[in-house]
């Protein structure tokens, strides 16, 4: 019979797990560390999650918008492959870019400036919305090769290649400014957006910038760089 749940305690445990994974990495995190950070005993922690793997799955699901309070307790232990697949699915769902899908479907956009601005803005919003999950995955990928491959090679690099192909097509049609190397240009676009939508929150001065003003300026400046 499932044990009665305490939503507040579950939230505290998952928040503690997120902070511990983000600070120590996946391999460096221990269940006892999470229990101490959550202010619970290790024994109680295991009544919520069977293992470190289960805790990581809980964190990823919560950051992906899953109602973890509806999950049966204790959460079972997934395999490493299942964890990597969960991260891949969660990030793919969070960073869908409909404006790029629409751009790929036409060779004659009615307004190239609006198209580029829309793509930049949607990238910004997608990264901003899942920045906590992105930071977690980036940190844990440092000591988890399979996760690194899923995130960087099968995830980010695939998207960078797609963005570069978009720039190639629009450049060949004369719709955007000439670009010598669209591979570098795609990384410039994505890394610029990623710093302002995500990494600046870990920067001493960057975190103080006004959120709305940052979004407006990033969209305007990147659009101007590409369209002229």
Features from the language model and the residues they span:
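Helix-turn-helix
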Residues: 12, 20-67, 72
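Amphipathic alpha-helical linker/stalk segments
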Residues: 59-116
């Amino acid at each position: 019979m499932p044990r009665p749940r305490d939503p507040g305690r579950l939230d505290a445990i998952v928040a503690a797990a997120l902070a511990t994974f983000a600070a120590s990495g996946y391999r460096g995190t221990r269940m006892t560390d999470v229990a101490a950070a959550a202010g619970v005993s290790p024994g109680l922690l295991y009544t919520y999650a069977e293992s470190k793997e289960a805790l990581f799955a809980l964190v990823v699901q919560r950051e992906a918008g899953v109602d973890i309070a509806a999950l049966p307790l204790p959460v079972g232990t997934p395999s490493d492959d299942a964890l990597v697949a969960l991260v891949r699915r969660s990030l793919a769902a969070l960073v869908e870019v409909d404006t790029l899908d629409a751009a790929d479907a036409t060779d004659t956009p009615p307004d190239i400036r609006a198209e580029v601005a829309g793509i930049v803005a949607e990238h910004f919003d997608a990264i901003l919305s899942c920045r906590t999950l992105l930071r977690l995955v980036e940190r844990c990928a440092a000591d988890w090769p399979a996760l690194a491959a899923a995130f960087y090679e099968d995830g980010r690099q695939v998207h960078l290649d797609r963005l570069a192909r978009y720039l190639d097509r629009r450049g060949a049609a004369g719709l955007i400014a000439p670009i010598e190397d669209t591979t570098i240009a795609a990384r410039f676009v994505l890394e610029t957006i990623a710093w302002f939508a995500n990494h600046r929150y870990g920067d001493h001065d960057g975190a103080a910038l006004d959120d709305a003003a940052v979004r407006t300026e990033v969209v305007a400046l990147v659009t101007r760089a590409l369209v002229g």
